[in-house]
Curated annotation (Swiss-Prot):
Main function: Probable transcription factor.
A GO term from the CC aspect: nucleus
DNA-binding region: 129-223
Residue ranges of the region described as Disordered: 1-25, 214-278
InterPro entries: Fork_head_dom (IPR001766), FOX_domain-containing (IPR050211), TF_fork_head_CS_1 (IPR018122), TF_fork_head_CS_2 (IPR030456), WH-like_DNA-bd_sf (IPR036388), WH_DNA-bd_sf (IPR036390)
Protein name: Forkhead box protein I1c
Keyword Transport belongs to the record: no
Tissue specificity: Detected at stage 14 (late gastrula) in a horseshoe-shaped ring surrounding the neural plate. In neurula stage embryos, expressed in the neuroectoderm and pre-somitogenic mesoderm with expression in the outer rim of the neural crest and neural plate at stage 17. Subsequently expressed at different levels in a subset of placodes, excluding the otic and posterior lateral line placodes. In tailbud stages, expressed in neural crest cells that originate from the rhombencephalon and migrate to the ventral part to form the hyoid and anterior branchial arches.
Source species: Xenopus laevis
Biased composition (Polar residues): 1-17
4Fe-4S is among the record's keywords: no
GO annotation (BP), single: anatomical structure morphogenesis
Subcellular location: Nucleus
Length: 381
């Protein structure tokens, strides 16, 4: 059995286990063999865990054969696993294989894309689209031409030869190149000479646009002919519309200045017609005359005493003469007449309807408090 070849410490551990389980001679012997085998593999794992940290990074040297770890002794030497006489014979091949595998993977990841062959690089270029616009491709083709001019077929040929991506499908990018040639102002069409045999016109770069192409990149945004023509039409319309607008703007002050007096006159007419219409209406005249007569009768009734009546009569007659004398002075504008239409009738103390009808315009500019009349001369709104 394998227990004969075990060290003394393993035998003592096995005997101690045998003493703890006294179940029978046969069961004890089987348990001892099982424990001996278990302790053997346990010691192998222990040695492996203690031995692994002893290896440094420098020990993992790259092998000569990158596939050596597949054909190493861990695969071919299977007898070391079957026979347990040398426990280190099983673990050493695994270390060799692990070292070789790690070195291979580290060397693989550290390199660049140099592992790709030339054929694989060409295949990659066929898949990846070049980072150039169609206008940039056309410009590169024309600039690399000896005479700085190419036909459409020659542009196709240059793009297909220098960029393998466009060799797969020709329909899509050829249409795009034709559209860019016709819509971009930087490409000019040059007619073919009579002595030059062949078909199709030449295409050249505009001298003003040569600086716009820098290493295949177009520096500014292309403008279409339709956009440029529409912009020119807008500018022409704007230039034509500016003098017309200026003329209208110049005439507007001259039109407003004569019309402003007319508007003022119309407003004055509106303001003046309202008092004139009120004074000319007989109904309102009769109303105001009746109100003044009621005022005079009420004043006479309230002041029935002799002295008070005389004073009131003197005041009324004096004020009546004052108002009749002051009426002759046209001091108040007619615009303030409409503001006093809502005043009550007790503000006026005229004694006769003749004065009311004759000097009705002054009636709206006077008011009386306690039978005293004051003229509102120079009043402003």
């Amino acid at each position: 059995m394998n227990s004969i070849h075990l060290p003394s410490n393993q035998r003592t551990s096995a005997s101690s286990l045998h003493q703890h389980h006294p179940k029978g001679a046969q069961e004890a012997s089987e348990m001892a063999v099982y424990c001996d085998n278990f302790s053997m593999y346990h010691q192998q794992n222990l040695h492996s865990s203690q031995r692994a940290p002893n290896y440094g990074i420098g020990d993992y040297a790259p092998p000569t054969n990158p596939y050596l770890w597949l054909g190493g002794p861990g695969v071919s030497n299977s007898s070391s696993y079957l026979h347990g006489n040398n426990p280190t014979s099983f673990m050493s091949p695994s270390y060799g294989s692990q070292r070789q595998f790690l070195s291979n993977s580290s060397s693989f990841c550290g390199t660049d894309l140099s592992w790709l062959s030339v054929a694989s690089q060409e295949e990659l270029l066929k898949v990846v689209r070049p980072p150039y616009s169609y206008s940039a491709l056309i410009a590169m083709a024309i600039q690399n031409a000896p005479e700085k001019k190419l036909t459409l077929s020659q542009i196709y040929q240059y793009v297909a030869e220098n960029f393998p991506f466009y060799k797969r499908s020709k329909a899509g990018w050829q249409n795009s190149i034709r559209h860019n040639l016709s819509l971009n102002d930087c490409f000019k069409k040059v007619p073919r000479d009579e002595d030059d045999p062949g078909k199709g016109n030449y295409w050249t770069l505009d001298p003003n646009c040569e600086k716009m192409f820098d290493n295949g990149n177009f520096r500014r945004k292309r403008k279409r002919r339709s956009d440029s023509s529409s912009a020119e039409a807008v500018t022409v319309k704007g230039e034509e519309g500016r003098p017309a607008l200026g003329g209208k703007g110049g005439e507007s002050p001259s039109m407003l200045t004569p019309s402003s007096p007319e508007l003022e006159a119309a407003s004055d007419d509106r303001k003046s017609t309202s008092p004139s219409g009120i004074t000319s209406s007989p109904c309102l005249n009769n109303f105001f005359s009746s109100m003044t007569s009621l005022d005079t009768t009420s004043v006479n009734r309230q002041m029935s005493l002799g002295l008070v009546n005389e004073l009131s009569q003197r005041n009324i007659t004096g004020l009546g003469s004052f108002t009749s004398g002051s009426i002759a002075e046209p001091s108040v504008d007619l615009q303030d007449n409409s503001l006093h239409l809502n005043r009550p009738s007790y503000y006026s103390t005229f004694s006769s309807t003749h004065q009311n009808n004759q000097f009705n315009s002054h009636f709206y500019n006077t008011f009386s408090v306690n039978s005293l009349i004051y003229a509102r001369e120079g009043s402003e709104v």
